[in-house]
Every structure is written in C-alpha cells, then in structure tokens.
C-alpha cells in the first residue's frame, strides 16, 4: 500500500480562478484531485 505524499494531499487554491475563468489555460500540468481523478492542470480541476 502507498501512503499519500504531501504533494498529492495539497488542495489547490481555486479562489484565483473564480472571477477569472477566462484566464484558464489548456497547458498540461497534471494535478491529482481530492476525488482521486487526475486533471490536466489546476485551472481545469
């Protein structure tokens, strides 16, 4: 069994995207969501 690492357990701060969703890019920078799914980047998460 694997223990979650610190990197995987950090939750992204989505507040910077709330008012500026149009600034979300499609750059690939995978992030693991708290739901166990991998998202393309923090903005898409």
UniProtKB/Swiss-Prot annotation:
The entry's keywords: Calcium, Glycoprotein, Secreted
Glycosylated residues in this chain: 13, 41
One of the Pfam families matching this protein, by short name: Kazal_1
Domain of life: Eukaryota
Cellular component GO terms, alphabetical: extracellular region
Signal peptide region: none
Gene3D superfamilies in the record: 3.30.60.30
Subcellular compartments: Secreted
Domain Kazal-like: 8-45
Mod. after translation: Glycosylated.
Keyword Nucleus carried by entry: no
UniProt main location, coarse: secreted
Role played: Inhibits calcium transport into spermatozoa.
Name used for this protein in its record: Caltrin-like protein 1
Species for this entry: Cavia porcellus
Lineage, opening ranks: Eukaryota, Metazoa, Chordata, Craniata, Vertebrata
């Amino acid at each position: 069994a694997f223990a979650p690492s610190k990197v995987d357990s950090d939750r992204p701060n989505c507040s910077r995207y709330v008012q500026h969703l149009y600034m979300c890019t499609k750059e690939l920078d995978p992030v693991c969501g708290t739901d166990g799914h991998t998202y393309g980047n923090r903005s898409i998460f």
